[in-house]
């Protein structure tokens, strides 16, 4: 019998790079999506930090009245932001080479587009990287599906909404006060609080938080005690141990007795329980993202502009009227120099600023 030995061919540089990129033994999994994710997120982060600290004022409304957003121009951590690109730019792609000078690019809010586009590409790649690592480890794809909820939300406020409104100046500013300003203006223009998709999102986030708190407290409370009465119950569990030490039947029985017998049907086994925990907030945020996307094209929330009137034709004010007045007030205040008279106020009869209160003791 003859044995033939062949010398193993040395791997080329590309093959070694590919093995390193796709290796699941690295402390930090890179992956092919990571090859694009790392530079885009680094670019977005570096540009955001520089712009947040030192960017000059930006003519966001396109009326030659720049808005200061950086720390060096008088803002603090709360009021600072990367200001959206100018309304004069609209939806045009505005990289550095499209401007006549760096000063012009900064004045028109070019850093906002740079940060947003690189950030969106980065989070898309992070989602793909989650799928890629799950695939290589033989896991199911639910991790990246769950992550698609915040990705959809970011895409809605940074990309879909500006496209629907016709300008990146309507995108969400990259700062704390800017985020709240975006929320107020969104409520004023679209009445998002009365949109059913937003209601589903609120139910999903709050319901998910409730389920998470219930689950964590139940698991912690139903640890199997493997200790004697003289020892602390905490000695019955070692942090990081492989085997389960809690009793799901005990937790299930607790919930069924605490509320009612059939309430805990979805927690009858670990799979159904954790599916509900994942699906509840994810589906809610999906609906909120979809709601922002349809309101981007002015398919707005419900409005109750027609007040209830009595037999004499006098208005009977409801909470809907209070919300309408608040919306009008917020719309008057935002972009007050660009819009001297908002259209929905100019086209109707003047309305009192406040609802009159009943006389006391009269």
Curated annotation (Swiss-Prot):
It is an enzyme of class 1 (oxidoreductase). One of its GO terms (biological process) is photosynthetic electron transport in photosystem II. The record marks 190 as: Stabilizes free radical intermediate. The chain crosses the membrane at residues 29-46, 118-133, 142-156, 197-218, 276-290. One of its GO terms (molecular function) is iron ion binding. It comes from the Bacteria. Chlorophyll a ChlzD1 binds at residue 118. Pheophytin a binds at residue 126. The record marks 346-347 as: Cleavage. The D1/D2 heterodimer binds P680, chlorophylls that are the primary electron donor of PSII, and subsequent electron acceptors. It shares a non-heme iron and each subunit binds pheophytin, quinone, additional chlorophylls, carotenoids and lipids. D1 provides most of the ligands for the Mn4-Ca-O5 cluster of the oxygen-evolving complex (OEC). There is also a Cl(-1) ion associated with D1 and D2, which is required for oxygen evolution. The PSII complex binds additional chlorophylls, carotenoids and specific lipids. Keywords: Calcium, Cell inner membrane, Cell membrane, Chlorophyll, Chromophore, Electron transport, Herbicide resistance, Iron, Magnesium, Manganese, Membrane, Metal-binding, Oxidoreductase, Photosynthesis, Photosystem II, Transmembrane, Transmembrane helix, Transport. It is a multi-pass membrane protein. It catalyses: 2 a plastoquinone + 4 hnu + 2 H2O = 2 a plastoquinol + O2. The keyword Manganese applies. Pfam families: Photo_RC. Belongs to the reaction center PufL/M/PsbA/D family. PSII is composed of 1 copy each of membrane proteins PsbA, PsbB, PsbC, PsbD, PsbE, PsbF, PsbH, PsbI, PsbJ, PsbK, PsbL, PsbM, PsbT, PsbX, Psb30/Ycf12, peripheral proteins PsbO, CyanoQ (PsbQ), PsbU, PsbV and a large number of cofactors. It forms dimeric complexes. This is Photosystem II protein D1 3. It comes from Gloeobacter violaceus (strain ATCC 29082 / PCC 7421). The gene is psbA4.
